Amino acid sequence: MLKLKKAIKRITLCVAVVFLLQILFLFSGYNNSDVKAATTFNYGEALQKAIMFYEFQMSGKLPSWI
């Protein structure tokens, strides 16, 4: 019975510590408000690289268009 009480106290303490840490991070101003949008992507280049990767990974009897 004594071990059960100690275990319950430890679990309660751990939950309280985690809760307090969450509140600390929530209200401490820990936010990335300086996050900027990603630069524009060149989808044509991405498609070209994807097709090249597909062609380079081919094995076996290759089609005539290569």
UniProtKB/Swiss-Prot annotation:
Gene3D superfamilies: 1.50.10.10. SUPFAM superfamilies: Six-hairpin glycosidases (SSF48208). GO terms for biological process: carbohydrate metabolic process. It comes from the Bacteria. This is Uncharacterized protein in celB 3'region. It comes from Caldicellulosiruptor saccharolyticus (Caldocellum saccharolyticum).
